[in-house]
């Protein structure tokens, strides 16, 4: 599980930086709390809800698969 959480967080960070978006901007655009994005990227949150990851994917303009693989 820890590897999956890290992978999701790493992928979110990769795409966020690729598109030049800060955690703060991503959280506002996805209508999520800043700490939610920060914790997922750090891998320190319990398994992130699929709905949350989907919101992030949609906001970044990538697929859910892009973030979980």
Where is each model-derived feature located?
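Short amphipathic helical patch at the helix-1/turn junction of helix-turn-helix
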Residues: 6, 17-18, 47
């Amino acid at each position: 599980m820890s590897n999956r959480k890290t992978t999701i967080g790493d992928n979110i960070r990769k795409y966020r930086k690729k598109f030049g978006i800060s955690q703060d901007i991503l959280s506002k655009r996805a209508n999520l709390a800043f700490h939610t994005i920060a914790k997922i990227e750090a891998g320190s949150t319990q398994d992130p809800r699929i709905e949350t990851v989907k919101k992030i994917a949609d906001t970044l303009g990538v697929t859910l698969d892009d973030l979980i693989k």
